[in-house]
A protein has these predicted regions:
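Conserved class I S-adenosyl-L-methionine
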Residues: 1-41, 49-53, 75
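Helix-loop segment at the mouth of the active site in Rossmann-fold oxidoreductases
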Residues: 9, 93-94, 111
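Class I SAM-dependent methyltransferase SAM/SAH-binding core
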Residues: 39-95, 101, 118
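Conserved Class I S-adenosyl-L-methionine
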Residues: 49, 170-266
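A short SAM/SAH-binding and catalytic strip from SAM-dependent methyltransferases
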Residues: 100-115, 139
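Conserved catalytic/acceptor-binding region of the Class I
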Residues: 117, 122-124, 128-203
Length: 266
């Protein structure tokens, strides 16, 4: 699933919540109509957790995966040594033959603002007739977990203020279901779009920080020195404690909306 700042992804950090991160892949694959594909590609395969779901579902298919992160690919190769993995970039992806299933778990949100529909529709060109593009993305930029990142980043006179202003790390919400429909439907025999909000159970508020350290928090803390990073995370944590109340047993529920799309080519 790695695409942004490709050299700083940590497979170990991402894998701390691997069961929760894998569940959307299982839910997405359940809606893919292709029962016996010959060629399957996992776009942004991460440490191979989503690829393992594909291997279980399609034991007779030729399955491959790619990711921009060398560390993610290293972990994927360790996990699934019989699958072809490579370090590659989605924007330059061009398979040598049509693919039956293009699968992607939590990657397309990292595509450049304004080019997402263009890139996604271009992927349809790589499908065999009747093939499916299936992808899932976090749809949570307006959730407190992510809004708080931006609020802390925008605070004036902080050790991180100038660094993050220069980093220009703003990211827009992925296009809406109606925009996705208009972009993809002319290319599809069938188009299925839905949204699910998962309720992830965190041990405490620090658990939310650990979750987002593996993904959405990275662009904010990676450019900072250790002292600025520590203070940024402490300030961010205080905002989380105000936004998410602890349950009676001390656990914290993290609502996590995700958008799913299965586009089947005519």
């Amino acid at each position: 699933m790695a695409q942004a700042n490709k050299d700083t992804w940590s497979a170990d950090q991402y894998s701390k919540f691997l069961k929760d991160r894998t569940r959307p892949s299982i839910d997405l694959l359940a809606h893919v109509p292709n029962l016996s594909p010959k060629r399957v590609v996992d776009i942004g395969c991460g440490p191979g957790n989503s690829t393992a779901v594909l291997v279980d579902q399609y034991p007779n298919a030729k399955i491959s995966g790619f990711d921009t992160s060398p560390d993610m690919i290293r972990k994927a190769k360790e996990t699934l040594p019989n699958v072809d993995f490579e370090v590659a970039d989605l924007q330059s992806f061009k398979p040598d033959a049509p693919v039956d299933v293009l699968f992607s778990n939590a990657v397309f949100q990292w595509l450049p603002n304004g080019k997402r529909i263009e890139i996604v529709t271009r992927l349809m060109d790589h499908l065999a007739p009747g093939g499916s593009l299936a992808f899932q993305i976090p749809y949570n930029l307006n959730e407190p977990s992510h809004a708080s990142m931006r609020e802390v980043a925008g605070m004036p006179n902080k050790p991180w203020s100038e660094t993050l202003k220069r980093a220009n790390i703003s990211r827009d919400q992925f296009p809406s279901p109606t925009e996705i429909w208009d972009g993809l439907k002319p290319l599809c025999a069938d188009l299925d779009i839905w949204q699910t909000t998962y309720m992830h159970v965190m041990e405490n508020h620090e658990g939310i920080v650990e979750w987002v350290k593996g993904t959405g928090l990275r662009p904010y803390v990676d450019p900072l020195d250790e002292n600025a990073k520590k203070e940024y995370i402490e300030t961010y944590l205080e905002k989380l404690k105000k936004a998410y109340r602890a349950q009676n047993d001390g656990k914290v529920l993290l609502p996590f909306p995700r958008l799913f799309v299965v586009a089947t080519k005519a």
